[in-house]
C-alpha cells in the first residue's frame, strides 16, 4: 500500500524566551497513522505539539510545517483547525455553563450534525468509548464539578465526535485513573478505523508500542524514528544520555 503524507515538519526551530527548545526537528505523519513521540521531560515534546497546532507563543524562527500539502507556518490555530487538525491538551479546560452534550456537539463532524438522532447516538457512543455513562454525564457541566480525569475523558470523546484528519494528543492518559491502557488503545483504534491520523505525545511505553511508528526526541532533536519496539529499546539504552542533555523546560 502506498503511504500518503499528511503532515511534514521540516527543520523546525522554536525558542521560548532566550532558549532554543526545538533544534531543527524533522517529522512526518502519514494518513491513517498512529505516530507516537517519546522522550524525557523537557525534551520538547509538548512544544512540538503546540507549534504544530499554532498555539500563541510557539512561533517557529525557522522551518516549515506542511499539512495536506500546504505550508501552514503562517496560519493561526483557527485556520489550522478548519483544515482538519485538533489538539487535546494535557490539562483539559473547564467550560462554565456548558453541558457535556453541548460541548461534544460543538466540534462534531458535520456528517453527524445533519440529523439530531444520529448526533445524539454519536455522542452516546463517544462517551461509552471513554468509559463514561451517557445517562450520568450528558447533562453534567464541563466545570470544576468534574475531576481532571473526567474532563480528560470528555476531551477524548470530543475528538471521537470530531473525527479530525489529524489529532494531536498530549499525554492522553494523564490524570485518567485506569486499570490498564486498553481503553485508551481502543480510542486510538476507533479513530484510526475512521481514517484519522494521531500524533501522540506520551511517556508510557504501553501506548508508544501501540503506535505504527515512534520518534524519540532528545534535547529538542529527533534522534531516532521507526519501529516502536526498536525505538523503545534504543531509548532504554540511551535514556541516561538523553536526561543529561535536557535542560529544564518543555
From Swiss-Prot:
Keyword DNA damage found: no
Gene3D superfamilies: P-loop containing nucleotide triphosphate hydrolases
Pfam families attached to this UniProt entry: ABC_tran
Binding site for ATP: 39-46
Signal peptide boundaries: none
Alphabetized SUPFAM superfamilies for the sequence: P-loop containing nucleoside triphosphate hydrolases
Protein name per its UniProtKB record: Uncharacterized ABC transporter ATP-binding protein MJ0035
Naturally occurring in which organism (per UniProt): Methanocaldococcus jannaschii (strain ATCC 43067 / DSM 2661 / JAL-1 / JCM 10045 / NBRC 100440)
